[in-house]
Amino acid sequence: MSFSQDMDNEYEKLIRRMNPPRVVIDNDSCKKATVIRVDSANEYGILLEVVQILTDLNLTITKAYISSDGGWFMDVFNVTDQDGNKVTDEVVLDYIQKSLGPEACFSTSMRSVGVIPSTDSTVIELTGCDRPGLLSELSAVLTHLKCSVLNAEIWTHNTRAAAVMQVTDDLTGCGISDPERLSRIKNLLRNVLKGSNTPREAKTVVSHGEVHTDRRLHQMMFEDRDYEHRLVDDDSSIQDERQRPDVCVDNWLDKDYSVVTVRCKDRPKLLFDTVCTLTDMQYVVFHGSVDTEGTEAFQEYYVRHIDGSPVKSEAEKQRVIQCLEAAIKRRVSEGLKLELCTTDRVGLLSNVTRIFRENSLTVTRAEVKTKGGKALNTFYVSDASGYSIDAKTIDSIRQTIGQTILKVKNNPQEQQQRQKSPSHESPTRFLFGGLFKSKSFVNFGLVRSYS
């Protein structure tokens, strides 16, 4: 670390000591949510850090009011637990107070929530072309190379796929440090990701540091330019347009702000996804509001680029819109949700995904976890040919894997009915609407040889 960086860090610490963050947790003023107020000295990226803390605790942010103009950061969040109730767990409340309050150091401890601790494991980051059977193929390669997958998250969007996997050696249960072995793992996985006829580059990165999985997946897909529109030959492109988020960008010239508004279906971690992307694109949120009404979410941000300027051109405007749309859609869980809970064993992920592939199912998103010798995996699957999933197919898969081990969270008939039902729009209401006058507000095929 350079002398100038040391001086910057000491200056930041001095500012925090002079202006310590203040956190107020209120369970009385709102009937349906816990209200969390955060006041602190303002610094770049602090909004994302706070939202990341709350999101990683599996809290749902139903409303938010953001103000960080000048040197002070003042935010209010209405949050609920996973069941839609106020947060009453004293352990969680104490953690919020310590993580966001005077004891917190935003540059270090706050990032420990939701982070993969990789001291005794190896983290593999993968980016490549999505296709039927990809997850099955990747996990088969890792099993062949005597690697166990402890935790993993896989996203697919717009013909691209990204994964962050935490692996260990089968025999030792520890991370893999042999350079030659790591090089072989990287090369074989890269060959799988390349496929046979894709011009796009495939990337594999191996590390031993701590990784915040969701943060990295957004960064990886952003760097891979998954937001760029691609031609699709089937009817999925029509359905994709129907589900497209409504994102608008307008300049408020009097105040040199760009006003970004987002309207889309509400879901967990939505605020994190949009704020994460704005931060990665180097935009600073000065004011904003977030509101949910029924199944819809409304977000409004008053932003400038980190250089102090609003959006400068039509091309930049379209890029902001495309990137926010991609950030929202990456985590949209398309397909049938399957949950697997069983005793963990070597090759489990490879075997399960092989069964999916053999039954013509493709994994659109997956979350793999191991805890206390148990495998807790969630898969979102769809028919590789684009048809509705036959209930008989699911029954057959469950019989093969185990009826009590693999459970269906939403059946194909219910899924199809929801897709056919029209969405009901609600009027947008924003906190700063009266104060600021703006103009408007895959597919996964088994390659037999991976070497």
Swiss-Prot record:
Keyword Ribosomal protein: no
Compositional bias segments (type: Polar residues): 410-420
Spans annotated as Disordered: 409-428
Gene3D superfamilies membership: 3.30.70.260
Tissue: Highly expressed in flowers and at lower levels in leaves and siliques.
Residue span(s) of domain ACT: 35-118, 123-200, 259-335, 337-416
Origin superkingdom: Eukaryota
Pfam families: ACT, ACT_6, ACT_ACR9_3rd
InterPro entries per UniProt: ACR1-12, ACT-like_dom_sf, ACT_dom
CC annotations in GO: plasmodesma
Induction details: By the cytokinin benzyladenine (BA) and cold stress.
Keywords linked to the UniProt accession: Repeat
Function description: May bind amino acids.
Protein name (Swiss-Prot/TrEMBL): ACT domain-containing protein ACR4
The gene coding this protein: ACR4
